[in-house]
Every structure is written in structure tokens, then in C-alpha cells.
Amino acid sequence: MSKYFLDTNILIYAYSNSEPLKADKANALIFEGDAIISLQVINEFTNVCLKKLKLNATDVSTAILEISRAIEVIGFSLKTQLHALQLSQNHSFSFYDALIISTALENNCPILYSEDLQHNQQIDHRLFIVNPFVYG
């Protein structure tokens, strides 16, 4: 299977107790596949865990280390950021969603798993957005 990119919401479901079925699917994507995330995703995950999930810094650090052992964590370049600005303008994405999309494209990921973006949307004829929680 090809590498795939995970949006922040996938990691959030894996570490929250709110929806067990989504947590199971998220954990499978994180720990059983060939996933990539960016430092941006780690930063967003950290912020949500601290502010919304009310986890303490030690638990968040443990989660980040666990994730980083299972998933390739990458940075992004200025070129990626500039491409994100174009994507944001051309597709009406928020800048931060466009940055995740741009990073996935730069790393030749054919799939971006996200609950927050349009399911089955294709970007630049190379990247499909897939909501892993769509059943049936």
C-alpha cells in the first residue's frame, strides 16, 4: 500500500474517548499502515489535546512520542507554503487545510484521510481526500 497522509482530526479521534468506532479506525490508520504527518499536524494535535481534551502536558508528550514511532513526521518547505497559498485561493480551502494538502502533494501521497474536507475530492489530479469514517 502507498503512503498516505493523515489530517489532525484522525489523530484526535485516536486519543479521545468520545467515539469508539472512529477511534478504532483512526488507530488502524496510525498504527497499522504507512502514514505520514507533518509537524503542523503535531502542533494542531498538541493544541487540541491541551485545550479541548484537557490532557496534561505529560500525556500529550507521551502521545506525540507514540505517534512519532508509528508514523513518519515531516516538515515542509517555503515552496510548500507558497503552493498552499495557491491552493487556498484556487479551491477556497482555509490556509492551514491547504498547507496539509500541499504537504501531502509534495510527499507524493495519493490519499489524504480527513473528516473535515470534502470526501472523494481530487486535488491536482494526484491526491484524493477520503473520509475514513464514511461507512457503506
What are these model-derived regions, one by one?
Residues 1-37, 52-59, 135:
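Short, well-structured N-terminal submotif of metal-dependent ribonuclease cores
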Residues 3, 102-136:
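Acidic, PIN/NYN-like endoribonuclease modules and their adjacent C-terminal/linker elements
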Residues 7-9, 44, 97, 116:
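Acidic active-site catalytic centers that drive phospho-/nucleotidyl reactions
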Residues 39-42:
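Short acidic alpha-helix initiation/capping motifs at coil-to-helix transition points
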Residues 44-72:
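Active-site-proximal, substrate-binding regions of enzyme catalytic domains
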Residues 72-115:
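Active-site neighborhoods of divalent-metal-dependent phosphate/nucleic-acid chemistry enzymes
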